[in-house]
A protein has these predicted regions:
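Glycine- and other small-residue-rich loops at beta-strand/loop junctions that grip anionic moieties
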Residues: 22-26, 53, 57, 77-79, ...
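Shared catalytic-loop signature of beta/alpha-barrel
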Residues: 66, 72, 81-96, 104-210
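Metal-dependent enolase-superfamily TIM-barrel catalytic cores that perform enediolate-based chemistry
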Residues: 1-93
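A generic structural signal for well-ordered alpha-helical surface patches
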Residues: 35, 161-164, 219
């Protein structure tokens, strides 16, 4: 918890506006984590929890989500497995519920809407099978009036560029997105938003300013690949 608080403080110092806390393993620890971070950073940052389907039952998820509500939780992401259980949690809490693992395809989102199983949708380029299919997921969510964010699968620069363009080109993406700041090792560090990487295969790092990643005006995804690094890191 102390390490998480330190990282939250660093995120605030670097201009990050929303932080996501990983939960779903130890329920008591999850409450202590959100409490500790809220006490440390005050009301300045949005805070959300991603349980990755970790709570064993809808009843448990409802209990822990309600316990977190006093700490101004922006949303709870995928607290339980399955759309039916998600619907039960959504009905019984005031905190908005985001669907992630339950929302892979446009058909999934239709079922979520029909069962009122979430208040918002997390979109990926990877889950549905690429940018075009991700835009279909977004279109269904938009038709249903559900806001979205874009999440990533810990991609390096090419995938992050795709996620960045998906977020920037999709009007219903209004919540903070999980897009790490990919940074080649000879270009410095990406700060708290680039901690996943020691290096990257893109030539230039993403431009990061006050918590935002700036979309490149260059053609395509706006990136250039370092061919030497691509060969170096290639798995034969």
């Amino acid at each position: 918890i102390d390490k998480a608080v330190d990282e939250a403080m660093q995120a605030r110092a670097e201009g990050v506006k929303t932080i996501k806390l990983k939960g779903g393993v130890e329920q008591k620890r999850d409450i202590e984590l959100i409490r500790g971070i809220r006490e440390a950073i005050g009301p300045e940052l949005n805070s959300c929890v991603d349980a990755n389907q970790g709570y064993p039952t809808a009843k448990a998820a409802v209990k822990i989500t309600k316990a977190m509500e006093k700490y101004d939780l922006l949303y709870m992401e995928q607290p339980v497995e399955g759309i039916d259980q998600m619907a039960e949690v959504t009905r019984r809490v005031d905190t908005p519920i985001m669907a992630d693992e339950s929302a892979w395809t446009p058909q999934d989102v239709i079922e979520i809407v029909q069962k009122k199983a979430a208040d918002m949708i997390s979109i990926y380029t990877t889950k549905p099978g690429g940018m075009f299919k991700a835009k279909k997921v977004a279109a269904v969510a938009e038709a249903a009036g559900l806001k979205c964010n874009v999440n990533g699968s810990v991609e390096t620069g090419v995938g992050n560029a795709a996620n960045l363009h998906l977020a920037a080109s999709t009007g219903i993406v209004t919540y903070g997105c999980v897009v790490p700041v990919s940074t080649p090792k000879d270009k410095g560090k990406g700060g708290i938003a680039g901690i996943y990487y020691q290096d990257d295969v893109i030539v230039e790092p993403f431009v990061y300013s006050d918590g935002d990643i700036i979309v490149s005006p260059k053609p395509g995804l706006g990136i250039e690949i370092d061919e030497d690094k691509l060969k170096h890191y290639r798995i034969a």
